[in-house]
Amino acid sequence: MRKVIGIGETILDIIFRNNRPHTAVPGGSTFNGLISLGRLGVPVSFISEVGNDRVGDIIRDFMMENNLSTRYVDRFPDGKSPISLAFLDDDSNANYTFYKEYPKQRLDVPMPEINEDDIFIYGSYYSLNPALRGRMVEFLNYARQRKAILYYDPNFRKA
């Protein structure tokens, strides 16, 4: 059966309404799409990284509750899981502030099993980040060699 493998950032979004915390939910551009696929019963694996901290636990648990494999999620001991503060205006448009503290060694995970016609999803700034470029190229070359379908989601937003 065809499966979906995605790579991208995971972050805990803390959403504010009227300058007060309203809710907190895990997110990320590629992550959000994969969550939807997992909820539909599509076999999904996610390549990502979170800290070995309480926020990382929340993100990991959310992934498992929504049928995403966490086998390829790096739980780094140095640094902290990323957090975003999303301040909603009266029209529910968000203005974001990000807090990120990654270790020097990034995406320390094995290559996932990828077969012909599997779908490999990547996107957003995460896939263009100079700190991850070498590792991202490794994953993309690996997926291409195995004849996976490569799908790039630029995650453009209205400015």
Predicted regions mapped to residue ranges:
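Ribokinase/PfkB-type carbohydrate-kinase core domain
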Residues: 2-5, 62, 70, 92-159
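Acidic active-site catalytic centers that drive phospho-/nucleotidyl reactions
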Residues: 9, 13, 32, 153
